[in-house]
């Protein structure tokens, strides 16, 4: 797991934490713990490549996470419209959940007016909070689904309404579960991709620190 915070701005990329305090300008100049370092070509090239990689990868990770959340919302929304109709309140719940999860993401990769800040210590807390938010939201989804099916059933009442509701709810749960599994697989693939990129960045960071000794 990353051990540093990263602060990206037009003037520099700052890496703070296990690495001490490194500031790298877009041309590869380095200030370490407040001291400007005099670098040879190879050191400057490593510093330049590392800050370029951070400038590229952090927005890629942030953008990818936002897109995956939106894709999951749209896919689940389709299931809800099909099963409960376009007026279902569950659709609002999904939109709210999407917004809440994006806010959680912003605790890890914070958007500033002049760039991004990556907070490495927020990762574990956000994982936990995110899980709680999803669980609470799913409880609300279930409650709304029951209510809405009850209303629907009362309108078409014939036979045993409770049995019909439970049957419909089983169908809805299955449809949501199937779609959720699809999206989860997608998220996992994205997660692996992120891990590979973070590992590559860590390798670059270590190489740079070794070169600066």
Place the predicted regions along the sequence by residue.
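A cross-kingdom marker for long, charged
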Residues: 163-213
């Amino acid at each position: 797991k990353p051990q540093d915070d990263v602060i990206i701005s037009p003037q520099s990329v700052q890496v703070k934490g296990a690495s001490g305090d490194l500031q790298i300008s877009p041309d590869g100049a380095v200030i370490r713990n407040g001291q400007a370092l005099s670098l040879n070509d190879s050191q400057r090239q490593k510093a330049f490549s590392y800050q370029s990689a951070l400038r590229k990868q952090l927005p890629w990770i942030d953008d990818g996470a936002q897109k995956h959340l939106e894709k999951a919302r749209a896919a689940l929304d389709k299931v809800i419209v099909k099963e409960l109709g376009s007026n279902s309140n569950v659709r609002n719940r999904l939109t709210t959940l999407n917004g809440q999860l994006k806010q959680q993401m912003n605790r890890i990769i914070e958007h500033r007016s002049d760039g991004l800040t990556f907070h490495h210590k927020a990762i574990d807390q956000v994982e936990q909070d995110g899980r709680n938010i999803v669980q609470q939201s799913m409880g609300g989804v279930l409650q709304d689904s029951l209510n809405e099916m009850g209303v629907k059933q009362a309108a078409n009442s014939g036979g045993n309404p409770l049995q019909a509701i439970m049957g419909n709810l089983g169908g809805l749960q299955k449809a949501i579960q199937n779609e959720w599994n699809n999206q989860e697989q997608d998220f996992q693939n994205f997660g692996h991709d992120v891990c590979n990129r973070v590992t590559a960045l860590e390798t670059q960071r270590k190489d740079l620190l070794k070169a600066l000794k």
